Amino acid sequence: MLSMPRSSAHSIISLFNDESPEANEFRRLYSKLKNLYADEEMKNFLVTSAKMNEGKSTTAALLACTIARYRNTKTILVDCDLRRPRVHQLFGIPKEEGVADVLTGARKLDTCFKQTPIENLRLLTAGGVVTSPTELINSPRMHDLFSEIKFYFDTVIVDSPPVIPVTDALILSPEMDGALVVIKAGETHKEVARRAVDLMRNAGLNILGVIINNQKGVLPYYYDHKYYGYSYYNLEEKAK
């Protein structure tokens, strides 16, 4: 179970120090992912959820911080949730000059990267308000955007909209090497979570696992995606 606090500006960086429980558990999560998928070249990760308010943005932010520091590669966190963007709030930076502005041609991509206190981590925020987010994400320009991002960065973490309400996360699937699904314990019905996983599988997303987010502050557990099928097991069991 993973505790995802409601983060105010700058709190992601304050949470992410070597001694914090959050940093320790995300190091553990990253280590498990790295060991389990050592034979696969995983560079582009999508983080999503079944529905809203399950902690996906905080998860994506902490995972990006972890990979930037401990993988020691050029890492970028991209906010593709154009309806309810949150990455800029988590890091306390402006939302403007981001994904939407690049896709509409208002800005060049390399002028929109934003620095963070973590040396190897940059951000691409959601950008300005758009009237048709799905249409914009589904445009050919999105593929061009990710092609250019991958030229500049070694690891890409994408915070996408939830799967059930809109199709944006599924549209992004061709650009991703794998996906993590964040589920809120005690609130997300199993059938809703299973439906989200099925939609992602049908879209061709490689589901790396399910992160159970518990607001009560219990230390995290990471489950293989079979948790929402007929069986479940954590990574310690899978690694045996």
Annotate each PLM feature.
Residues 1-240:
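P-loop NTP-binding module
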